[in-house]
Amino acid sequence: MTVIIQQSKTYLTTKIRLSQEGCSVSIKHFFLDGNTSKGYVTLVKNIVKTINKVYTLKGSLGNEKNKIFKRISGNFEQQDLEIYWLHNPSDENMLDGIVIPDKGIAVIDGSARNGIEAKYSNFIERIFDLDEALDKTQLVINKNSIIQMQEEIEQLHEGAYAKFAKGKEIHEQKEELYISAMDFDKANKVTAKLAANLFHDVIVAKENPIVEQLFFGAATPNGAVNYIDSITSDIKKRYIIKGRSGSGKSTVMRKIAKYAENVGLAVQQFPCGLDPNSLDMIIIPSLSVAIIDGTAPHVIDPTRPGDEVIDMFELCMDQSIETKYDQRFEDLHVAYKQEMKEGTRLLQEAKQVRESLEQIYQEAVDSTIFTEKINEIIADITA
């Protein structure tokens, strides 16, 4: 079968639709930001680059913003449109925004952490400030408590990032040992074979391919959470790459992604939630193909007819390395798990403090003004 590629400028819409009229509403789940070993990392720039209309909701009322995101989502769901929910890595039950690809619309939390307003204010359609509905007198009464809680939340997050950074350092020690057993010629052959299978009958129809980025998973107060199954729900072919640390999984993805770009295909890249400089998944929507790192903490095993496992440890490594360094690997594994556990605990504490802070803001809401504000926001965005 020859594939002729036609790309869309609309965010994450260059994909094969498996159903047409009468399709059921689809909500896909992603993370826009991450609690990583590099600190708080946001991919909000990708939204600004690829979406025509970006709205932001700013303000201190996280729970209320979450409700508004879901109300706007519900409006577009009634139109049988696909919606992307962008979850908050510090509380995955809360949203940082939504995207409606077919409308070219995004509604994003305008918090200071993702920097969307500070960096991209000229490209924002409209900014809505929910703090306009707060009784400032009530907030002044609680000023010291608010400032103390804000500082505590920041310190707890910084502590978590330090733990994740230490975990990454330990992980890199494992990588170094495994890399010593790596046969790079074999790894290159695996990549070349995969590229040949994917691209041998592609006819390039457009230059300047679109490259998009989001996180499929994140370190959260509940541990590592991923939405791989949601994101790949309509993908026909999934290559699940297994292997040890340092077995070249991310390198394979980067090379395949580059092959795709070179022949004019759009690519969706999903950085690692711990190390955002590494890739954990790519999707080539026009081919309905995903290549996934199927190892912990996001273990993916073949469950669908189109799933295929590529085991880099079996194909490209001297497996005696594990016998040689058996105890060392075990010690590193235990140390890594401990750092990640501590980082998760700190995120849990930060979430608890944030919930207390949220309660203070909630008690300062002028319900009449707030209701008017919500109606204004929803009417403007869904018009």
Question: What is each PLM-predicted segment?
Answer:
Residues 1-23:
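N-terminal amphipathic/basic-hydrophobic helices that include classical n-h-c signal peptides
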Residues 49-85, 108:
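N-terminal ordered "arm"
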